[in-house]
From Swiss-Prot:
Signal peptide (residue range): none
Catalytic class of the enzyme: oxidoreductase
Cofactor(s) of this protein: FMN
Matches recorded under Pfam families: Nitroreductase
Family the UniProt entry places it in: Belongs to the nitroreductase family.
Enzyme Commission code: 1.-.-.-
UniProt GO MF annotations: oxidoreductase activity
Protein name per its UniProtKB record: Putative NADH dehydrogenase/NAD(P)H nitroreductase AF_0226
PANTHER family cross-referenced by the UniProt entry: NAD(P)H NITROREDUCTASE YDGI-RELATED, NADH DEHYDROGENASE_NAD(P)H NITROREDUCTASE XCC3605-RELATED
Keywords carried by this UniProt record: Flavoprotein, FMN, NAD, Oxidoreductase
Length: 172
């Protein structure tokens, strides 16, 4: 698949079939996440993979009761790992860790699309609850919950602002 076709084909999927995502496919998705750009190549991001139905339900409740999270066969929580970046960049490393994590999130979403699966970037959640549920160390911040599965819907791409409205040349 052409790269640009993939970018424009990606949509948010919130309805999944009950078909599982096998471990080999999951590893490809995680490897794609890890291939994302990274400040200083410090890769200040970590992935928590959840298949346990009860844990997925608790995550859904912590994410404003977005129950489609619990219905996905697998969920990846992408986390920023602050010390991994701060050891080189100091306090600014916090921002770089968050950038590393968000770059990985987009790679994961694109890999999912390339593999004919579906996913959605969930950013609306209670960070403290998610951290507690997943027993995250205090120096790690959950950045996104990504439910992944075989799509049970085929939504149309969402409308976007015209690029001309968002683009500034030479200055604002």
């Amino acid at each position: 698949m052409e790269c640009l076709d993939l970018l424009f084909r990606r949509v948010s999927i919130r309805k999944f079939t009950q078909d599982d995502v096998d471990d080999e496919i999951l590893m490809k998705i995680l490897e794609a996440g890890n291939a994302a750009p990274s400040a200083g190549n410090l890769q200040a991001r970590d992935f928590v993979v959840i298949r346990n139905p009860e844990t997925k339900k608790r995550l859904a409740m912590a994410a404003l009761k977005q129950m489609f999270i619990a219905e996905a066969p697998v969920v990846i929580v992408v986390c920023a790992n602050y010390p991994r970046s701060m050891r080189v960049y100091g306090e600014r490393g916090r921002l770089y860790a968050e950038q590393d994590a968000t770059a990985a999130i987009e790679n994961i979403l694109l890999a999912v699309t390339a593999l004919n699966l579906g996913a959605v970037w969930v950013g609306a959640f209670d960070e403290e609850q998610v951290s507690e549920i997943l027993e995250l160390p205090e120096y790690v911040r959950p950045m996104a919950i990504i439910p992944i599965g075989h799509p049970a819907e085929n939504p149309s791409p969402r409308n976007r602002y015209p690029v001309s409205m968002l683009t500034h040349f030479e200055k604002w």
